[in-house]
Swiss-Prot record:
Subunit structure: Part of the 30S ribosomal subunit. Contacts proteins S3 and S10.
Function: Binds 16S rRNA, required for the assembly of 30S particles and may also be responsible for determining the conformation of the 16S rRNA at the A site.
Source organism: Streptomyces griseus subsp. griseus (strain JCM 4626 / CBS 651.72 / NBRC 13350 / KCC S-0626 / ISP 5235)
Protein name: Small ribosomal subunit protein uS14A
UniProt cross-references to NCBIfam families, sorted A to Z: PRK08881.1
Length: 101
């Protein structure tokens, strides 16, 4: 089980990313576009720099939805490998079967 403070911090980061996502995309497009005048590009870079660090999507960590474990995350299930194995053996994941060959 991950610390509750780590899980809460990650949740706050997700909210911050969601809040700033549209404006960040606009600014990045202005910066990326080759025809943008230099002063406008500089203003966009400066505004992007003034945004909070946690507004960047790379700051969000994928965590197990059950206990918040940060490692071994499987996107398809939203679980860590440990929790996925437990739930698969218990039959809680429809369509998941143990392999045999």
């Amino acid at each position: 089980m991950a610390k509750k403070s780590k899980i809460a911090r990650n949740d706050r980061r997700r909210e911050t990313v969601e809040r700033y996502a549209a404006r960040r995309a606009e600014l990045k497009e202005v910066i990326r576009r080759p025809g943008t005048p230099e002063p406008e590009r500089n203003r966009a870079v400066e505004e992007l720099r003034r945004q909070p660090r946690d507004a960047s999507a790379t700051r969000v960590r994928n965590r197990d939805s059950v206990d918040g474990r940060p490692r071994g995350y499987l996107r398809r299930f939203g679980l860590s490998r440990v929790r996925m194995r437990e739930q698969a053996h218990a039959g809680f994941l429809p369509g998941v079967t143990t392999s045999s060959w």
